[in-house]
């Protein structure tokens, strides 16, 4: 797999390495997002060792730890995978040997899947705490703990009740790629097809690596999602089984959200559950970064709705899960062409809104946005004048106070996103200007179009942005 992005994370890891002091870096993020690949890339140019915690017993994990410590401390000859030396008798002995070695040597030690190690040897975090406190002022060890269990890493490693609380010197929450980064994984695809690949994978690095050069987009989608042996044909369901108890309930909830239910009571009705019971399931899905609870930009949270954050889950629950029988009977190609492909533009609507928000963020970094937004998101609500419901795809907002004696002035960048096969007309701009009126601010208007525009505008407040422009920043 080609190494893409992660420049900020790599630069920060290098700063930590060059400090020559004790460092404890916590790296976490959802499965398949590229954490391990990042750490291997970083370790390739430095001395150190890497181990993976096993979903196994304490003795197996102690063996893995012992071998990694021998490797880190130069006790395994170059080219040999394992030492003939006996395992350390305890985890304390293994880690103490590592810390002692680090008094005179700069060394990196990475424990991947740390939650598995901690589950098999529950005392490991406390033992690390004691060793860190004893050695931190003299040690040159750069210790990296990595994990995919979001709740474990946030609560039992970073949380204030963790023995390791306050010991970390940096933390890295590894997120899926933006659409611009995802493009580097599929350079053989057109811009439009790259956008669809981003939507189908949620920007997850490993999934993007499955798109083979030489295959058309249709061929890739069919082979990944709509064949019995496809690599993504049961991926969301499989991940839920790894992460959660009662996967059947979570499947039902995600299916309901993917098909349009967004408010607590709507979802509860669809899955035949009380709203109180539902809240616990929703919280777990939020912790896993599969769904998110959002509210209109600048508004109170009592208008909040739930939406699937990972667009691959939306695609899977909307198109793959309902057709699993046909896929198992080798009719997935027919399913794709008859039922899925005609609906791809509809599926891409929210994905394109996500891309537009990421484009605005990229422009902010370039310094080419009229003002610095304090919030970016969606807006929906009621027009007090017409009493009609209003939705705006993209709103970037800031209340700017230029004079300490004056009231802040609201600045708005409002956007409309159209993933359609025809150019946008001027009526879309007029509609956006009318709807933006309800937000009461000094507004700029950005239109995002899959297929360009049927008009030009000389209004300095207006930008017309097509897909190639979004990729050619």
Regions flagged by a language model, labelled:
Residues 1-333, 337:
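Phosphate-binding site recognition
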Residues 297, 306-473:
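A cross-kingdom feature that marks ATP-driven nucleic-acid transaction machinery
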């Amino acid at each position: 797999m080609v190494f893409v992005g992660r420049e900020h994370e790599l630069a920060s890891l290098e700063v930590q390495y060059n400090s020559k002091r004790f460092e404890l870096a916590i790296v976490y993020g959802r499965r398949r997002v590229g954490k391990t690949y990042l750490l291997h890339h970083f370790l390739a140019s430095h001395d150190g060792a890497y181990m993976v915690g096993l979903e196994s017993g304490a003795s197996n994990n102690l063996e893995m730890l012992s071998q990694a410590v021998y490797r880190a401390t130069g006790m395994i000859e170059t080219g040999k995978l394992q030492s003939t030396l006996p395992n350390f008798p305890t985890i304390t002995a293994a880690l103490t040997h590592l810390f002692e070695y680090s008094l005179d040597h700069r060394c990196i030690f990475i424990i991947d899947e740390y939650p598995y190690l901690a589950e098999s040897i529950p005392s490991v975090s406390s033992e690390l705490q004691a060793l860190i406190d004893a050695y931190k002022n003299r040690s040159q060890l750069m210790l990296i703990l990595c994990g995919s269990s979001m709740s474990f890493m946030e609560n039992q490693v970073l949380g204030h009740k963790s023995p390791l609380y306050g010991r970390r010197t940096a933390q890295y929450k590894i997120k899926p790629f933006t659409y611009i980064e995802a493009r580097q994984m599929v350079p053989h695809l057109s811009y439009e097809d790259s956008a669809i690949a981003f939507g189908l994978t949620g920007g997850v690095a490993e999934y993007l690596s499955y798109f083979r050069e030489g295959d058309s987009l249709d061929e890739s989608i069919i082979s990944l999602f709509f064949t019995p042996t496809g690599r993504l044909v049961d991926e969301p369901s499989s991940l839920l089984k790894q992460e959660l108890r009662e996967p059947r309930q979570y499947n039902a909830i995600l299916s309901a959200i993917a098909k349009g239910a967004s408010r607590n009571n709507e979802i509860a009705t669809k899955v035949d559950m009380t709203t109180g019971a539902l809240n616990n399931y929703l919280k777990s899905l939020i912790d896993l970064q599969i769904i998110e609870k959002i509210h209109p930009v600048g508004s109170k949270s009592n208008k909040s709705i739930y939406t699937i954050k990972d667009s691959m889950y939306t695609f899977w629950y909307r198109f793959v899960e309902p057709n699993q029988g046909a896929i198992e009977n080798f009719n997935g190609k027919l399913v794709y062409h008859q039922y899925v492909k005609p609906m791809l533009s509809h599926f891409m609507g929210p994905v394109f809104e996500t891309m537009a928000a990421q484009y605005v963020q990229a422009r902010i970094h370039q310094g080419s946005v009229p003002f610095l937004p304090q919030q970016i998101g969606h807006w929906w609500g009621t027009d007090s004048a017409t009493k009609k419901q209003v939705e705006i795809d993209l709103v970037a907002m800031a209340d700017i106070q230029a004079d300490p004696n004056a009231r802040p002035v609201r600045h708005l960048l409002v956007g409309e996103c159209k993933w359609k096969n025809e150019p946008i007309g001027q009526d879309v701009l007029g509609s956006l200007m009318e709807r933006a009126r309800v937000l009461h601010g000094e507004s700029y208007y950005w239109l995002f179009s899959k297929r360009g525009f049927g008009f030009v505008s000389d209004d300095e407040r207006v930008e017309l942005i097509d897909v190639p422009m979004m990729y050619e920043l």
